[in-house]
Design a protein with these regions (language model features):
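Conserved short "hinge" loops at termini or chain/domain junctions
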Residues: 1-105, 139-141, 145-185
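Short, hydrophobic/amphipathic alpha-helical patches that form generic packing surfaces
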Residues: 60, 111-127
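Short conserved catalytic/interaction loops centered on acidic-Pro-aromatic/His motifs
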Residues: 129-139
C-alpha cells in the first residue's frame, strides 16, 4: 500500500539561490589578473534563457533520481509536458510506502532544493569559471546521495508490549486458547 505525497520546489527560490551563489563566487574571483570576474560569473536577467535550460536539465535529473517513487500520473505529466519546467515550480507526486518516515519530508524538500541549485550552479560554472565547477558537482552528488538515503528511510514496526491489552488477539485472546495455564507453566 502506498500513500501519495506531493513535493514542490519553488523555481523563483532556486534561481534566487543560484544568483546569490554565482555573485559570491564572482566576487571571490575578482583579482588583479581577472578584474572582470564578477561580471562574467554572476548571473543576471540577461542569462535567463540559458538558466531556464539549466533549470529544465536539473528538473529532469531530479525526476530521474526520484523515478522509483514517482507516480504514473506524475511521470506522464513530466514526459508529455517538459515545457512546464521553464515557467513553473518543480512539482512531483511520489508514491511512498505507508512505513516511510514522513517526518523527513521537509529534509527531502531541502535536499532537493540543494540538488537543483547546485546542479544549475555547476552547469553555469562549467561555462564561466571551470576551476570552481568540481566543488559544486560534488555538492550535487552529496545532495543526490542524501535524497536517496532519505527516501529509503522506513519507520520501525511498532512492538507490542507483553502486557498490552491486545495480547493473543490473533488467536482470539487467552480465553479461547487457554493461556499459559494449559501449557504446564
Amino acid at each position: 500500500m502506498t500513500i501519495t505525497q506531493n513535493i514542490q520546489v519553488s523555481k523563483a527560490r532556486v534561481m534566487d539561490e543560484v544568483a546569490k551563489a554565482t555573485a559570491y563566487i564572482g566576487q571571490k574571483a575578482v583579482s588583479q589578473q581577472d578584474p572582470d570576474a564578477y561580471e562574467r560569473i554572476a548571473t543576471t536577467d540577461a542569462n535567463r534563457e540559458e538558466l531556464d535550460r539549466y533549470w529544465m536539465e536539473a528538473c529532469t535529473a531530479a525526476s530521474l533520481l526520484l523515478d522509483h517513487w514517482l507516480t504514473d500520473q506524475t511521470s506522464q505529466v513530466l514526459s508529455h509536458h517538459p515545457e512546464l519546467g521553464t515557467a513553473h515550480d518543480y512539482k512531483v507526486t511520489l508514491g511512498m510506502p505507508t512505513n516511510w518516515n514522513f517526518a523527513y519530508l521537509t529534509s527531502v524538500n531541502e535536499a532537493l532544493m540543494s540538488y537543483l541549485v547546485n546542479s544549475i550552479v555547476t552547469k553555469w560554472l562549467l561555462r564561466t569559471q571551470k576551476q570552481d565547477a568540481a566543488a559544486y558537482a560534488a555538492l550535487v552528488e552529496d545532495a543526490a546521495r542524501q535524497i536517496t538515503q532519505l527516501m529509503l528511510v522506513r519507520k520501525r514496526p511498532p512492538r507490542r508490549s507483553s502486557g498490552s491489552s491486545d495480547d493473543g488477539e490473533l488467536w482470539g485472546g487467552p480465553q479461547l486458547w487457554g493461556g499459559p495455564q494449559l501449557w504446564g507453566h
